[in-house]
């Protein structure tokens, strides 16, 4: 049994130590994100037996952004299976920025990872759907199943993103021209942008992590969301590419599968035990929450979790 007092103490200590840490800045290339109050901070744990521990602004709803890639990858694995995902999308880190087109050029237009923009747009196109609206509704539904029914599209975030996503449109056309997009290019880009524009809070983000930790069963709803056999593929991708250019550093220092988003959220999974999540808008140069990384790492260290430990 996990000690409830110890878990609450871990999140309290992480929040107290790092919630006012200086450094980083909000993502400024998306107008909505630039205007989120930079002093916000939160950290939460959701365990596989459904207990919740949190500190800070844990009810504040923020843009899911790139963490949505985890949900869409999960749905693609359910739809077409792990071999097809690896064949059509790839399963390797790029070693390049998350929105880079260089990796596409170096590999004949094929994306390498579903957790960077090119691979994520391709993954969105891989979802079984007859049209854009069905594709979008299926992706929104998997987000809600994994994290909570309150996850919903923000029209304000979506509008802010749709008017500035020229780079992603270019990526979509490159994928399409190389034969690695499985629906209309602008449909894929539009739905991808929408999936990044949903709002979530820190407890819901930790619930997403706990659902993965529990082998695909949401510990708050007790409903199976994913096949257990698909979860290890998601966690492997998170370990390799979840924090972009910081992924290797994260694996070395923290040793947990993780995923960040430029909305300031960050997620880590302790398989079989819990999800840990944090939120704070200021980002490092790779697009990861400065305080969020510190808070999640602190919780993991205090509790002694690292998948590489014997």
UniProtKB/Swiss-Prot annotation:
<feature type="binding site">
    <location>
        <position position="66"/>
    </location>
    <ligand>
        <name>substrate</name>
    </ligand>
</feature>
<dbReference type="GO" id="GO:0006543">
    <property type="term" value="P:glutamine catabolic process"/>
</dbReference>
<dbReference type="InterPro" id="IPR015868">
    <property type="entry name" value="Glutaminase"/>
</dbReference>
<feature type="binding site">
    <location>
        <position position="168"/>
    </location>
    <ligand>
        <name>substrate</name>
    </ligand>
</feature>
<feature type="binding site">
    <location>
        <position position="117"/>
    </location>
    <ligand>
        <name>substrate</name>
    </ligand>
</feature>
<protein>
    <recommendedName>
        <fullName>Glutaminase 1</fullName>
        <ecNumber>3.5.1.2</ecNumber>
    </recommendedName>
</protein>
<dbReference type="InterPro" id="IPR012338">
    <property type="entry name" value="Beta-lactam/transpept-like"/>
</dbReference>
<feature type="binding site">
    <location>
        <position position="161"/>
    </location>
    <ligand>
        <name>substrate</name>
    </ligand>
</feature>
<dbReference type="Pfam" id="PF04960">
    <property type="entry name" value="Glutaminase"/>
</dbReference>
<dbReference type="GO" id="GO:0006537">
    <property type="term" value="P:glutamate biosynthetic process"/>
</dbReference>
<feature type="binding site">
    <location>
        <position position="244"/>
    </location>
    <ligand>
        <name>substrate</name>
    </ligand>
</feature>
<comment type="subunit">
    <text>Homotetramer.</text>
</comment>
<dbReference type="GO" id="GO:0004359">
    <property type="term" value="F:glutaminase activity"/>
</dbReference>
<keyword id="KW-0007">Acetylation</keyword>
<feature type="binding site">
    <location>
        <position position="192"/>
    </location>
    <ligand>
        <name>substrate</name>
    </ligand>
</feature>
<feature type="binding site">
    <location>
        <position position="262"/>
    </location>
    <ligand>
        <name>substrate</name>
    </ligand>
</feature>
<feature type="modified residue" description="N6-acetyllysine">
    <location>
        <position position="294"/>
    </location>
</feature>
<comment type="similarity">
    <text>Belongs to the glutaminase family.</text>
</comment>
<keyword id="KW-0378">Hydrolase</keyword>
């Amino acid at each position: 049994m996990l000690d409830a007092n110890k878990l609450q103490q871990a999140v309290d200590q992480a929040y107290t130590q790092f919630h006012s840490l200086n450094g980083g800045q909000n993502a400024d290339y998306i107008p909505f994100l630039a205007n989120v109050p930079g002093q916000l901070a939160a950290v939460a744990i959701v365990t596989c037996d459904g207990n919740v521990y949190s500190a800070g602004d844990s009810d504040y709803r923020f843009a899911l952004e790139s963490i949505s890639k985890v949900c869409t990858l999960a749905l693609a694995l359910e739809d077409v299976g792990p071999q097809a995902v690896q064949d059509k999308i790839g399963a390797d880190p790029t070693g390049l920025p998350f929105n880079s087109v260089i990796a596409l050029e170096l590999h004949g237009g094929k994306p390498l990872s579903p957790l960077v923009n090119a691979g994520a747009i391709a993954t969105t196109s891989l979802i079984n759907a007859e049209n854009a609206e069905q594709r979008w509704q299926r992706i929104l539904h998997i987000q809600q199943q994994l994290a909570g029914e309150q996850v919903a599209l923000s029209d304000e975030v979506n509008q802010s993103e749709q008017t500035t996503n020229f780079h992603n449109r270019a990526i979509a056309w490159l994928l399409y021209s190389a034969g690695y997009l499985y629906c209309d290019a602008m449909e894929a880009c539009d739905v991808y942008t929408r999936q990044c524009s949903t709002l979530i809070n820190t407890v819901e983000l930790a619930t997403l992590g706990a659902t993965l930790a529990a082998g695909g069963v949401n510990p708050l709803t007790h409903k199976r969301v994913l096949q257990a056999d698909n979860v290890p593929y998601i966690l492997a991708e998170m370990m390799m590419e979840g924090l972009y250019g910081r992924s290797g550093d994260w694996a070395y220092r923290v040793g947990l599968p993780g995923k960040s988003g430029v909305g300031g959220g960050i997620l880590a999974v302790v398989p079989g035990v819990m999800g840990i999540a944090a939120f704070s808008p200021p980002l490092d140069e790779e697009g990861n929450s400065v305080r969020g990384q510190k808070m999640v790492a602190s919780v993991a260290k205090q509790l002694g979790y690292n998948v590489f430990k014997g």
